[in-house]
Amino acid sequence: MSNTAVLNDLVALYDRPTEPMFRVKAKKSFKVPKEYVTDRFKNVAVEISNRFGEDDSETVTIDSVPLPDLADILTLGREENFSLFIPKHRNLSAKLINIFLQAENPKHLLSIACYAHDRVNPYLFIYALSVALIHRKDTKSLKIPNQIQTFPDKYFDSQVFSQGKEEMTVVPQGLRRPIEIPRDYTASDLEEEHRVAYWREDLGINLHHWHWHLVYPTDGGEIVTKKDRRGELFYYSHQQIVARYNFERFCNALKRVERLTDWQGPIKEAYFPKLDSLVAKRAYPARVQDMTMQDLDIPGQNIKVDVDDMIRWRDRIYRAIADGFITATNGSKMNLDDVTGIDILGNIMESSELSPNRQLYGNLHGFGHLMLSYIHDPRSHHLEPFGVIGDFTTAMRDPIFYRWHAFVDDVFQQFNGSLPRYTAEQLDYAGVQITDVNIKTPNAPDNEFRTFWQQSDVDMSRGVDFQDPGSVFVRFTHLNHEPFSYNITVNNTGNGVQEGTCRIFLAPATDERGNPWLFNNQRVMFVEMDRFKVTLRQGQNTITRNSTQSSVTIPFERTFRDLDTNRPAEGSEELDIFNFCGCGWPHHLLVPKGTPDGFKAQLFVMISNYADDKVEQDLSGSCNDAESYCGVRGGKYPDKRPMGYPFNRVARQGADTLQRFLTGNMIVQNCRIVHSDRTVRPRS
């Protein structure tokens, strides 16, 4: 069996994940050793395999190998929900990841995975296998299916599945119609927060959050957790999520999200997710209005944490920021300086295994998610599962996610506010002056973005178990924008060619009341649009950059990539890149929605000195086209500056507005975002 064939066989394990291995998967019929078959099916496996086998299926014979000890891992039942916020689940996933990482080669891994497949909780199995495949050198070129294909129940209303199963059972392949999801299916317009549900519940955003945490696990050993500036990237990627959400709120006449700081008062936001777990066979619980966070005691999950614990952890972190150092497990002091301090703080806040002292600083971010997710049954009296905020895959659907992360980001901003302010000389680039910038959108006035609604189809058949094979599509509506380009005029008065990093950000022009911004309020509202290297010859230079080249986003086709289509050649560099780059922000949400009369925004462009920005490394064959939020596979973050530069610190004395903050290598352009309430039908 060739290595390519084995890799394809590993991908087949994602097909219909709750079905046993002896059922045909992705047109492959797996013949597993008898000892691999669970007791439930030992007497019927061959008969069922023959009955449901497909005539054109390929037979894959699995070798018998020494079997791993799964005893601890099996303490999580097959029909339970799985959450990486639950420490017990994190530990179990780390154990399974290490079992998969220690396999001698892909063929050995396939055999172990086939054994684990029918025993381990499906959510846990797919997560651990995905992390292992991404981080093993001999499988990193494997194209991992996106989670919509594997577990569509985490993305679609439960009504979709009854319609889908009917379509798959009754209607022949080729005659099936897409099942359309209404844009407003979780609440009515009477609910104010529902104005931005199209953004929170967007499939691409939730896939991005899932994939980011797949690439940056909190546990599993250094091979999967120890990545360059991962704590800082946790801070920055989530800060940008909150900033983008606030931008979207402004476009819908909502004020900035309020930080969740009162942990003993009522929470006004309710949320009813309308999702059912097809693995746990239970609905995700709702949260009604005015519930309060309470001490958690969930014996079945070994969770016991009090609100007072959270307050102690918060206060210790604030004290560390004020003191300028944290205390490591061995009692030594680690300075929170202006280079590594934000990274250390990020590891503490996320509470990854890179945290210098989990015992002292706790798990503030993670247990915040858990307290909110069990708010309906904090002591497990009713044996209710956690809500959507307790799962990376579904958390961004819930309005409370953004209130919690507004608090988390405020902790980081407390630290950023303690750092030395950039001087004008530090920000400037001698000899480089930006004289003009404009945005070009086809058939639109200069400096105007245009957005609209787009309908797209995604195949969910691979995640619908125990049904006849064949595609069944779900049609959903999402925001999109017209392609555009930046045209930047730069004057280089230096003695020769200069190299720089062009940094492009966008922010609302005024606050929610229509008042001019103070710089230190506006700086956290800027969303990164692009970052790229430029070469400036002497004299005037014109830089043109297309929106599709953004360092923040990945294309629509990669966000919703299919197992079989758009696949690069086996063994090619493109295939390795294709897989890791599933992490980027969805391109269809690069531009905020805007308003019909044109939402006023400010485009900020800066060119910094590349000599101060560059990181020496070979990026050939690495994924770096969505580097801003996801970094570079197997390499260092490709910008030496702090993430979010130059908006990561409080402004210098006297620079109380954006205009006063500017130096010669910066420019601001007023622009508008015009939304057309039209819907474009699916792409062919």
Curated annotation (Swiss-Prot):
Cu cation A binds at H209, H213, H238. Keywords: Copper, Disulfide bond, Glycoprotein, Immunity, Innate immunity, Melanin biosynthesis, Metal-binding, Monooxygenase, Oxidoreductase, Secreted, Zymogen. Optimum temperature is 35 degrees Celsius. PROSITE patterns: HEMOCYANIN_1 (PS00209), HEMOCYANIN_2 (PS00210), TYROSINASE_2 (PS00498). It is found in: Secreted. Its EC number is 1.14.18.-. SUPFAM superfamilies: Di-copper centre-containing domain, E set domains, Hemocyanin, N-terminal domain. It holds the Pfam family Hemocyanin_N. GO terms for molecular function: metal ion binding; tyrosinase activity. Precursor cleaved by PPAF1. The keyword Isomerase does not apply. Its cofactor is Cu(2+). Disulfide bonds join C581-C623, C583-C630. InterPro entries: Di-copper_centre_dom_sf, Hemocyanin/hexamerin, Hemocyanin/hexamerin_mid_dom, Hemocyanin_C, Hemocyanin_C_sf, Hemocyanin_N, Hemocyanin_N_sf, Ig_E-set. The active site is at E350 (proton acceptor). Gene3D superfamilies: Di-copper center containing domain from catechol oxidase, Hemocyanin, C-terminal domain, Hemocyanin, N-terminal domain. Belongs to the tyrosinase family. This is a copper-containing oxidase that functions in the formation of pigments such as melanins and other polyphenolic compounds. Catalyzes the oxidation of o-diphenols (N-acetyldopamine, 4-methylcatechol and dopamine). Cannot oxidize monophenols and p-phenols (L-tyrosine, tyramine, gentisic acid and hydroquinone). Binds to the surface of hemocytes and is involved in hemocyte melanization. Activation of the enzyme in response to bacterial lipopolysaccharides (LPS) suggests it may play a role in innate immunity. Dimer. Might form a homodimer or a heterodimer with PPO1. Might interact with PPAF2 (via CLIP domain); the interaction might be required for PPO2 activity. This is Phenoloxidase 2. The gene is PPO2.
